[in-house]
Amino acid sequence: DRGMEALLLDLRGNPGGLLTAAVSILGEFLPPSTEVVFTRGRNPEHTSPAMKTPERKRRNRSYPVAVLLDRDSASASELVAGALQDLARATIVGETSYGKGSVQRVMPMGNAALKLTIATYHTPSGRTPQESGIIPDVEVSISDEDRANLRRQRRRDSLTPDQRQILDSWVDPVVSRALQAVSKQ
């Protein structure tokens, strides 16, 4: 944190994870006991009161934050982005996310299992990313070539020297726009 001027949180390609983990991550950026998500189900037992960020000592993080999303950012990553957007803590940059705002329960059935959607989750403002996704504040079109370079970048250690050289000259358009966005905050 010392000397940090801004943070880019890259959630591109992140398929999600546990709701509780997303709430814990949000606790790194928001004050304790901030309401960040609630669930709404057809059955009242699947509707929850708002989940809050953890009660823990939080370092003062006043630097600007940009969250990077793409069409493959889903579920818990959408919750993190949506809550930070709703609470004006981050600028969302990139593409509209996947649109998976569902809460699912796995029901074991012998040698198989059934995954049943029991609710949708909602950001602090009450919106759900289900089907519509999280719409970025700064939209950036990502070309197929940029998408391929991003995949290469993530496995850079396994690339040949020639492949690394191509990446050395590549400028990630989403990161570039995110840096512009945080420099204006």
What are these regions (language model features)?
Residues 6, 16-75, 102-108, 122:
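Gly/Ser/Thr-rich loop/hinge elements
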Residues 1-14:
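Short acidic catalytic loops
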